[in-house]
Amino acid sequence: MPKVLVLYYSSYGHIETMAEAVAEGARAAGAEADVKRVPELVPEPVAKAHFFKLDQGAPIATPEDLVNYDAIIIGAPTRFGRLPAQMANFWDMTGGLWLKGALIGKVGAAFTSTAVQHGGQETTLYSLLTNLIHHGMVVAGLPYSFAGQMNMNEITGGSPYGATTIANGDGSRAVSANEQEGAKFLGRHVAEIAQKLNA
């Protein structure tokens, strides 16, 4: 049974919701899946003033946790078309793991959220995946076998580079059913690949 880590950062809860869906998909494929988050860097008074969701239940991850998993799926919202400082800071602390080649051969994937459809989803996914590639991980996307990517009946996230959601500029749009299905598919897909690689 592969062990999957879903590692995320979420300001307003959209990525937290996606992370839980990713983990659900991995578990459906027979994997053991843990959900952890990276530390918040924004001072608490500022975070509260901007209505950040600070009551997230997932434990805080450390870089050392990464070696315990066969697959690592990372998620974070966009910040001007790239990963946010919180996730970048976490990966900046993994230099020791990189020196040892500790993550080489593990499966990796990514998911993100943006305010609007054209708010930098794929560039953010690229910036998340770059960390995994530099660590020598085997990167998986969200294949078109997930039929929801071809959904033209609603505004929806989804990219061959990873699962995505659209939050609206004020964060008022909830993660849609189709987007949650995409996240579950990604988790299941990664778990199945990890299972094959570890067979």
Curated annotation (Swiss-Prot):
Keywords: Flavoprotein, FMN, NAD, NADP, Nucleotide-binding, Oxidoreductase. NAD(+) binds at residue 12. Its cofactor is FMN. Coiled coil: none annotated. The keyword Nucleotide-binding applies. GO terms for molecular function: flavin adenine dinucleotide binding; FMN binding; NAD binding; NADH:ubiquinone reductase (non-electrogenic) activity; NADP binding; NADPH dehydrogenase (quinone) activity. FMN binds at residues 10-15, 78-80, 134. Binds 1 FMN per monomer. Substrate binds at residue 98. One of its GO terms (cellular component) is membrane. Its EC number is 1.6.5.2. Residues 4-190 form the Flavodoxin-like domain. It comes from the Bacteria. The keyword Nucleotide-binding applies. It catalyses: a quinone + NADH + H(+) = a quinol + NAD(+); a quinone + NADPH + H(+) = a quinol + NADP(+). SUPFAM superfamilies: Flavoproteins. Belongs to the WrbA family. PANTHER family: FLAVODOXIN-RELATED PROTEIN WRBA-RELATED, FLAVOPROTEIN-LIKE PROTEIN YCP4-RELATED. This is NAD(P)H dehydrogenase (quinone). It comes from Beijerinckia indica subsp. indica (strain ATCC 9039 / DSM 1715 / NCIMB 8712).
